[in-house]
Amino acid sequence: MRRREVVTLLGGATAWPFAARAQQPKPNVGYLSGRSAETDAAMLAAFRRGLGEGGYVEGRNLAIEYRFTDGRYERMAALLAELIGRKPEVIIVVGVTAEPTLLRQMKTSQIPIVFVTGADPVRTGLVASLNRPGGNVTGICTLVSEMIAKELGLLRELIPSAKTIAMLWNPHNSSEEPNEAREVTAKLGLQLNVLNASTDSELNDAFAMLDHQRANAILVTTSPFYLTKAKQIAALAAQYRVPAIYVRREYVEAGGLMSYGYDIFDSYRLVGVYSARILKGDKAGDLPVLQPTKFELVINLKTAKTLGITFPPGLLAIADEAIE
């Protein structure tokens, strides 16, 4: 065999593994949210940043399949089953509820799952413990029930004369929030009225009841459905001239009075970081469930003026951002 033929054959043999690598399919990630694509846009950007920190870029070396329920909790289980059927390498589930079918699917999935939930995942049986989740599940736990005491305290500081506080709550959520709120309001000497709402019409009805209940303020709890209706809820609070506190800054940006909650963007970045680690071989059950460490108070001075409210100096001093 002539030397040129030998060199050609060797060169071709050397190129085969490179060609094989180039033809390998991109890893696939499933993303399921209880909100809408529009509502999740900023959080998804943070999620992609976290993936990027691990070396994964959507469209380049990673594919992502998205599913959104647009605030309709009843669709979560069906859409998760659909994603599981697509057999991605990892699935992100945002807005985990206490719905038994959804929890059972997540616990028994052979595909690693990274969640974002406001409920205690140990109490709901989703993980064995926060430090050692076990199984095939891990994620971010915001434990919103623990923020309720702070939020109610802020309302009390804003309106010292308040006697009755209303609480807007989605009954599809865990019962931890109203139970925690009842304990806190009892200690503060306040009456708590829980208003259930999980549809547009129920939101309108809930706010219409505020005058009848003589509520001095309202606490709007966390809910993917509520977040998709942030503008509507902020407008209702303005219409009925009731001071409101929210968990997320998006409500304040939509015209709400004030919010106190965790830094959602940092949490979603960490979801991306965890997803990248799992794609590289880490087991979900070995990764501890993370909790937020960054919190922020955002106030809307324009809304306060419209309501005839003046933020006390103490609240102004600790606010992370004031929207004018």
Model region roles, listed by residue range:
Residues 1-324:
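Short hydrophobic alpha-helices and adjacent helix-cap/hinge residues
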